[in-house]
């Protein structure tokens, strides 16, 4: 039977991608349905209890700038907040928070249940309704059919998921949850390229069996950082420390002696695992010169006795896992409450997607999260938001939107996936962005909130706060530009006390702040340049904008040059065999990838600058040279 009411957008899956997709579509005013096999696991953290980190924190801030959920949820659930790379430049500083799993899930569910235009429904999806290469709905396991103008697949590791512990394996979407086998089979019938990937998780330890007294503590930062632009530290629950232990030669011997029982090394697992989050087996074998690896013991929550040992993801048999755990300092008597495991699952080639994350072959069908070959909550959330907003726009007969590489880490993520694809689980790093000086955590709102407002994602309260911040920044910069000090002034000695080279000529507040040794706090502590802004975010922005003004201007010039190529569109139906002068290799790669623009084509491996020049000349000759707005 058909459900009586049609929807604009259906989201399949309630993880980090699915919840962001559902919130985005509903915020934009579209009638949205979120289908999940279990409402109680909405926003579940399947692996590590943490949000953020290098590159990942940038994505969370961007999701927040576009009105998303993740940053606000972790502000209410974070039990330890830190700024990573705090001593380095602003481009690579990143926020990270340990999470209370239960509080995080509660924060996500509360937001979903209070979001207008959004309906939750508990049923596993087994089929899609596709008519004339267009998706028009979904079918649940009890045969109930839902109609919609767009469908977003955010199914994580559930598609034909297979869990491995030692040489034993069984079907599962994650520990304790069933896999989605019928939907996997249905998707394999569609004209989509599919492969297998693998990820893993460590065993969980009973905290009461760990001797923390012999371990080093790691505390959060004080003052506590905040993730959301709209958040504040008073929202954070009780803060707790993490602890640090290490593997040792005994640990490594246990692993080496049992490699024949590892499903990866025995050839049982076919899927490729994440390069930047390897299993402990991989670390021991790949870094054989290391006699120890640092392991962080992270609490899973304020009301839980479980500890997440970050760094010993494994699929070795349970008896070997026990030996590994008990070989480490402080854990000689530790008990495992959940075994570690590896999981293999289907993923679909993201090169078959448009930058909006809509399928090139099935109209109205969007993909987001691990199904696209990524790993990590943050990467999933960012894709979910993008897919959800574009599903909403499609259902309203509006053009899709995707950020450029120069606008957001989300733009880098999507461009990497859709242009290059991936053969291993993809995670975000700041090093993946060529314009990272422009793509900082601190300016995510300046880059994206106005766009989010235009898209219908940003509410009135956030918009008012954002504009107030802009006004504070502009007013303070003007004040510093117009406040001067001369070498002969009475307070010049106070200024010189903060400078490595004394004043030799008249200088404005901005001139002084531009000096490497002068901070905004020091400058505004001087009577001539007081008072400091009360808005700490605006004050930080003033300092960064002034100190890095020259570098930022130079990078902006580079971006504008690149945009000329980036915005030169390529016809989706162009057969590159028609372009004389291109090599057979380039023709094959362009016909395979079908890039949307010259910029995208230039990033395909093997497509040379000479080939791009030939293509531009041919397009001009054919009268097909056009640029997007």
From Swiss-Prot:
The keyword NAD applies. One of its GO terms (biological process) is tRNA methylation. Transmembrane segments: none annotated. FAD binds at residues 13-18, 125, 180, 370. NAD(+) binds at residues 273-287. Its cofactor is FAD. It holds the Pfam family GIDA. GO terms for molecular function: flavin adenine dinucleotide binding. Keywords: Cytoplasm, FAD, Flavoprotein, NAD, tRNA processing. InterPro entries: FAD/NAD-bd_sf (IPR036188), GIDA_C_N (IPR049312), MnmG (IPR004416), MnmG-rel (IPR002218), MnmG-rel_CS (IPR020595), MnmG_C (IPR026904), MnmG_C_subdom (IPR047001), MnmG_C_subdom_sf (IPR044920). It is found in: Cytoplasm. One of its GO terms (cellular component) is cytosol. NAD-binding protein involved in the addition of a carboxymethylaminomethyl (cmnm) group at the wobble position (U34) of certain tRNAs, forming tRNA-cmnm(5)s(2)U34. Homodimer. Heterotetramer of two MnmE and two MnmG subunits. Belongs to the MnmG family. This is tRNA uridine 5-carboxymethylaminomethyl modification enzyme MnmG.
